[in-house]
Amino acid sequence: MDNRSAQQYNNSIRLQPPRAAVPTIASKSPSYRGRYAGPYLNVARAAARRNGVPGDLFLRLVQQERGWNAQARSVKGAMGLAQLMPGTVRLLGVNPSDPAQNLEDGARYLRTQYETFGSWRLALAAYNAGPGAVQKYNGVPPYKETRNYVRIIWGN
């Protein structure tokens, strides 16, 4: 192949392998449009910032979890604003009833999932269904709840 042909080959979009889109902090995802303006909003923003989580993403997560209800408890035992599961609470050593700790450790746990899976979309799936489910299915698990959760928070 001569130099000109090689250059044409390198520049040909058709011949280049597809590039996977990997969501990053800079990826376009919907901004937070919730109506909540209470005392936990700035606490959640600060927790996201300290843990390297996109602020709007974390605000949408908290909104989706229990609508900013600090006393919320799910039927599965998840607690507080960030709906931390009992096992996660034990792992992180936090008081889930303290809204600031709950948000801080929710953001920290989400960041840990991002570091594990390399994608905010998969981090959200792991936050909802558990990291084992994301590993088992090598992506967002086929659970309706988890798929809806990721779609609502991530936006697609």
Predicted regions and their residues:
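Cell-wall glycan-active module
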Residues: 1-60, 156
